[in-house]
Amino acid sequence: GIKVNHMIDEPTAGALHYAYESNGALKGYYAVYDLGGGTFDISIVKIDGFDVEVIATDGIAELGGDDFDTALQKIIQKKYLKQTGEEMEEGDFTKTMAEEQKKSLSKRDIKPKVLKETIEISRSEFEDEISSMIAKAEMTCENVIELSKIKLGDIEAVFLVGGSTRIPLVQQSVKRVFKMTPTATTNVDE
């Protein structure tokens, strides 16, 4: 059988990944911002070489990429109805299609083809739709900073974990809260 010595959460796993990627050179306090498909977690950790200690952690169980996909589906459904006068039927624009379009929106405005219609969606429209979700994540970050009792200026870096951290609005939000550009050098979730 398998012997499990310790269970760790995703932000801690992300911190360990960055610690090992740096060959043990990291020392100090770090934030790990984990926004994946289904959940959001933020942790303040202390890293000393290969040792990672969680100082504070918080999260939102119902916030992730799936919610952003749903938001994009809503935009597409509204625009389709406006252009055609018809409701989209179940399965006309699937969650998988929304996820692919979301990834494209992280790079540029998009024009997905829905049935026979081309629907233009700008990144700013998408960002407007998800901004309230990002605001909740910001409040959670501020809460975990307060819980950690670590001064914002003592945090060395913010590590991004999870596919949804590729969304430019997410990165801007992290920069605004932590007053630094986040580190997104690797995709530890892949």
What are these model-predicted stretches?
Residues 1-190:
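Oxyanion-binding/catalytic loops of NTP- or PPi-dependent enzymes
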